[in-house]
Amino acid sequence: PAEFHAQTAVEAAMTLHETVRGRVDDIESIVIETQEAGVRIIDKTGPLDNPADRDHCIQYMVAIPLIFGRLTAADYEDGVAADPRVDALRDKMEVRENKQFTKDYLDPKKRYIANAVQVFFKDGSSTDRIEVSAPIGHRERRGEGIPVLEQKFVDSVSPRLGAGQWEALEALCADRDKLAATAVDDFMALLVA
């Protein structure tokens, strides 16, 4: 879960996690390139007092996946935000507008929300610059989104249902024709624990 303008920055940071995870203390700086709207709406410095502040801060949304390799709803809560590495990384970030990203954001044929992230280390080395133009689920990446949505459904629903109930729901969802023929009240009954 990430604010719209930061979704691709989060994906770039998750890609970089394996490269930086053992070197977080060695980071000199982090450059985030974004669209004008991203700079205007989610480039935030200073204290972030609550989850609503954090989910509208591109620096926070990049720091978490760089450190932990994930960004979940729980990562916006106080316990995760209290990790001193988060603010230490935020302080090392420079957010800048990439004019091409802004142009592509405003282009109705593209509607990209591109971001790029690159990490620079104290020893002078750096990661690759990871650029992601469109988030998973964008019309150009729709196919990549289906497995992600299916997994999100499994992760959200299966722990709340008994094994037999989950298996029945899973079997129904796997059969498109049977699912389409199922009355809404019968389907909803499968979701009640």
Language-model segment annotations:
Residues 1-193:
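Terminal-appendage/accessory-domain detector
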